[in-house]
Amino acid sequence: ITFHPCDVVIERVASYGMAVGSEVFETCEWIGRFSQELEKLAKVAYIYRKDEKLMICGSTHANDATIRRALADRFAYGQPNYGKGKKKEPGFFYGFKADVWSAFAVAITYHDKEMERRMNERFKGVGD
């Protein structure tokens, strides 16, 4: 399967009916600013957090720790410390910190959704 290049994937903010602080509104502003400029240069895709949780963990009730565990199980099964390893024996996720885990989760979600979409497209009508 060949992918069309996607240069940027951005996690979108969604409303769940709860009160939010100024940080959320600032994040929305920055998403808009980045999107406006990046769309001039690249294909931009958007992912919601609930889609990350569902795609990676199979549940919308997942949290950051659950997502990290699922990613470690998928990409670094059996490696200690969520696949980070140690300085002398670095693992797949060596050097990952909070925001890097989140960015990786966004990228993997986009990849998996794109794979799913393309497979559905490819086999549309097969077996009907």
Feature-to-residue mapping (PLM):
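Phosphate- and other anionic-substrate recognition elements at nucleic-acid/protein interfaces
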Residues: 1-128
